[in-house]
Design a protein with these regions (language model features):
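Intrinsic disorder/low-complexity segments, especially N-terminal tails and targeting/processing regions
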Residues: 9-13, 162
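Low-complexity repeat regions of mature extracellularly deployed or surface/particle-associated proteins
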Residues: 20-227
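Bacterial Sec-dependent N-terminal signal peptides
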Residues: 1-9
Length: 227
């Protein structure tokens, strides 16, 4: 009987999944925050309680290694610079810059999101209620990144959005709007792999440019450009 109990306890111990949770609430002129989480089911904010930074300048770098991790972050500030690195599957990112507040313009934004893995859900919003004067966003899915959903919304005067993904069965929802400046908006989209669903909306009174390169079978692409 003792042997049976010992085996059951060992199985329970080896199947436990530990998770780390981080909740950030920050206000002030400047924040430089680096977060690294290694493991499964870790969170930086969640669907009900987002982490938040309200200040003039935010530098935010997050590395998550593992599966089923969550990032939910709201930034209210004039300048945002950040890099998010994901290695693993079934991760969820919801990042908003211009979440409200007296310094919420998100006037200058430079964001990079790198992911390696499958079934990830990435939602990036910059300039939700006030246009970003300058936005430079890079989203990169490394080789073998399959069945991911990437949604990027940028409202600004001069937005440059570059998306490069190597994998199959990915879905892209891209919306770039705002009046634009003399340079207009630029979207550079490169996809390698089969079964890509791409929806692009680009609007602004000045010149807009889309460079789209796709390599693979069964791509469904819809593009709408308006002044």
């Amino acid at each position: 009987m003792k042997t049976i109990i010992s085996v059951i306890m060992l199985i329970m111990m080896t199947t436990l999944s530990y998770a780390n949770d981080i909740y950030v609430t920050q206000s002030g002129n400047a924040l430089d925050l680096d977060i690294t989480q290694d493991g499964e089911n870790n969170t930086v904010g969640n669907s009900t309680t987002a982490s938040a930074s309200a200040g003039v300048t935010t530098i935010l770098n997050i590395d998550q290694i593992g599966d089923s991790n969550v990032i939910t972050y709201q930034i209210a500030g004039a300048t945002y610079t950040g890099v998010i690195n994901l290695v693993g599957n079934s991760n969820n990112v919801d990042l908003n810059c211009d979440a409200g507040g007296s310094n919420s313009s998100c006037g200058t934004a430079n964001a990079v999101i790198n992911f390696t893995g499958s079934s990830n859900d990435i939602d990036l919003d910059i300039g939700l209620t006030s246009s970003a004067n300058t936005a430079d966003v890079d989203i990169v899915g490394q080789s073998g990144s399959d069945s991911n959903v990437v949604a990027a919304t940028v409202d600004g005067n001069s937005a440059i959005l570059t998306i490069t993904v190597n994998g199959d069965t990915n879905n892209y929802l891209i919306d770039i709007d705002g009046n634009g400046d003399a340079n207009g908006h630029t979207l550079i989209h490169s996809h390698t792999g089969s079964i890509a669903d791409v929806d692009i909306i680009q609007s602004g009174v000045n010149d807009n440019m889309i460079t789209l390169t796709t390599s693979g079978d069964n791509a469904d692409i819809d593009i709408s450009q308006t002044d």
